Curated annotation (Swiss-Prot):
<keyword id="KW-0479">Metal-binding</keyword>
<keyword id="KW-0472">Membrane</keyword>
<dbReference type="InterPro" id="IPR018506">
    <property type="entry name" value="Cyt_B5_heme-BS"/>
</dbReference>
<dbReference type="InterPro" id="IPR001199">
    <property type="entry name" value="Cyt_B5-like_heme/steroid-bd"/>
</dbReference>
<comment type="function">
    <text>Membrane bound hemoprotein which function as an electron carrier for several membrane bound oxygenases.</text>
</comment>
<keyword id="KW-0492">Microsome</keyword>
<dbReference type="GO" id="GO:0005789">
    <property type="term" value="C:endoplasmic reticulum membrane"/>
</dbReference>
<keyword id="KW-0256">Endoplasmic reticulum</keyword>
<dbReference type="Pfam" id="PF00173">
    <property type="entry name" value="Cyt-b5"/>
</dbReference>
<dbReference type="GO" id="GO:0016126">
    <property type="term" value="P:sterol biosynthetic process"/>
</dbReference>
<keyword id="KW-0813">Transport</keyword>
<keyword id="KW-0812">Transmembrane</keyword>
<keyword id="KW-0408">Iron</keyword>
<dbReference type="InterPro" id="IPR050668">
    <property type="entry name" value="Cytochrome_b5"/>
</dbReference>
<feature type="binding site" description="axial binding residue">
    <location>
        <position position="67"/>
    </location>
    <ligand>
        <name>heme</name>
    </ligand>
</feature>
<feature type="transmembrane region" description="Helical">
    <location>
        <begin position="104"/>
        <end position="124"/>
    </location>
</feature>
<keyword id="KW-0349">Heme</keyword>
Length: 129
């Protein structure tokens, strides 16, 4: 482990790989190293999913879940340094439920609505007129 400046510690893959137990657990996320030993018992998904990624780059697994902003805030407190040679990238935050693609009018829903309205008019005219 070496210091590139007074605030950031740089770790190698080998150093991170030595921290794989419940009481001493590190992971790599987006080129950053996190000591999540004190958080593992609080993890909503259970400790098994974290232990499966212990000592490795867990970026893909973390991003696939789509963690909340709160999860990212917790990570900030667990950050201990950067991975040697890694390009630091911003973590992907969970997508909101509404995207540009699905925020428009939903055609099948409109078609059903038009059908029901037409049926209602037909039913009214044949039974009450």
């Amino acid at each position: 482990m070496t210091d590139t400046d007074t605030t950031t510690t740089i770790y190698t893959h080998e150093e991170v790989a030595q921290h794989t137990t419940h009481d001493d657990l590190w992971v790599i996320l987006n080129g950053k190293v996190y000591n999540i030993s004190n958080y593992i018992d609080e993890h909503p998904g259970g400790e098994e999913v974290i232990l499966d990624c212990a000592g490795t780059d867990a970026t893909e697994a973390f991003d696939d879940i789509g963690h909340s902003d709160e999860a990212h805030e917790i990570l900030e407190k667990l950050y201990i340094g950067n991975l040697k040679g890694a390009k630091i990238v911003e973590a992907k935050h969970a997508q909101s439920f509404s995207t540009e693609e699905d925020s428009g009018i939903n055609f099948p829903l409109i078609a059903v609505g038009v059908f029901l309205a037409a049926f209602g008019v037909y039913y009214y005219k044949t039974n009450f007129a």
